[in-house]
Amino acid sequence: MQQEILKIATRQSPLALWQANFVKDRLTEIYPDLTVELVPMVTKGDVILDTPLAKIGGKGLFVKELENALLNGDADIAVHSMKDVPMEFPAGLGLSVICKREDPRDAFVSNRYRTLDDLPPGAIVGTSSLRRQCQLKKRRPDLNIRSLRGNVGTRLSKLDQGDYDAIILASAGLIRLALPERIASFIETEISLPAAGQGAVGIECRINDQRVQKLLAPLADTETTACVLAERAMNNRLQGGCQVPIGGYAVLNGNELHLRALVGALDGSKIIRAEGKSAVENAEVLGIQIAESLLAQGADKILAEVYNG
């Protein structure tokens, strides 16, 4: 019998490779006879580091090359951070599985200060996220927010060199890279609402590839999937990519899904919020309803200013 092989397309950053190896390990644990190979790739988002992502078209910057590998048969699946995955997929591709979520909160990282509120007036804070920027400015208008690009290691190096007083990163990435000690404090979701899908890993494949979909099925996490579907439906209704000042975070209590969302002006002068609850099977409907509530409050005007700015 021929050895069964599964090829995983992945970015080359340490965090992306961790995620790909996480999927590889889970699959080989379930299927000992399966050979899983990584196909590391460089994406546009990895190459263009001197420009804010929103300026080069935020959608799909970290996934397009991986999707091309799926379409031309160079890989069978692609592993992504869910917050980087656009809502629209190329014809023939789709999201097969969302794995169990890591801590979705943002992390406050600093060598000198313990919390966001400990920072002195005018402190320099690094983040590449418009979502984080608007919420930071809302709480601390005095802070000097500066762009910060690159992988986790690069960002930490810039902090350690003294370029910033603090930086904001996803807690999930630091935990996965075995760097939890770099987290000075977790920023609670009431202060910084996470991005849709933050902390979750998704697996994309060809929608007609039933062999692969069957292999992946045991990796799906029901709770994470419901939460992320609600968050992404909200984001999609707002036509938000991964580089917009939109936050969305859902939690599941029993069979009830609770979704909170926001859209903010970049200077923090205005933040529009909405929240609601529904049965878990109505996750995507809830996401759309929350988006409609944000739009009714003027979210579209804020987003238009961001896109046209």
Swiss-Prot record:
What does it do? Tetrapolymerization of the monopyrrole PBG into the hydroxymethylbilane pre-uroporphyrinogen in several discrete steps.
Q: What remark does the entry add?
A: The porphobilinogen subunits are added to the dipyrromethane group.
Name under which the protein is recorded: Porphobilinogen deaminase
Enzyme class, first EC level, given as a word:
transferase
Task: Please list the disulfide bridges.
Answer: none
Cross-referenced InterPro entries, in alphabetical order? HemC, Porphobilin_deaminase_cofac_BS, Porphobilin_deaminase_N, Porphobilinogen_deaminase_C, Porphobilinogen_deaminase_C_sf
Q: Name one Pfam family in it.
A: Porphobil_deam
- Assigned protein family: Belongs to the HMBS family.
State the Gene3D superfamilies in the record.
Periplasmic binding protein-like II (3.40.190.10), Porphobilinogen deaminase, C-terminal domain (3.30.160.40)
Task: Extract the HAMAP family matched here.
Answer: Porphobil_deam
Can you supply one Gene Ontology CC term for this chain's record? cytoplasm
- Which cofactors are required for activity? dipyrromethane
Q: Which Gene Ontology molecular-function terms are recorded?
A: hydroxymethylbilane synthase activity
Q: Which residues carry this modification: S-(dipyrrolylmethanemethyl)cysteine?
A: C242
In its UniProt record, which GO terms are filed under biological process? protoporphyrinogen IX biosynthetic process
| Cofactor binding description | Binds 1 dipyrromethane group covalently.
Instruction: Write down the chemical reaction(s) this protein catalyses.
Output: 4 porphobilinogen + H2O = hydroxymethylbilane + 4 NH4(+)
EC numbers = 2.5.1.61
| Keywords from the UniProt entry | Porphyrin biosynthesis, Transferase
CDD domains given in the database record? PBP2_EcHMBS_like
What pathway does the annotation place this protein in? Answer: Porphyrin-containing compound metabolism; protoporphyrin-IX biosynthesis; coproporphyrinogen-III from 5-aminolevulinate: step 2/4
Subunit structure as annotated in this protein's UniProt entry: Monomer.
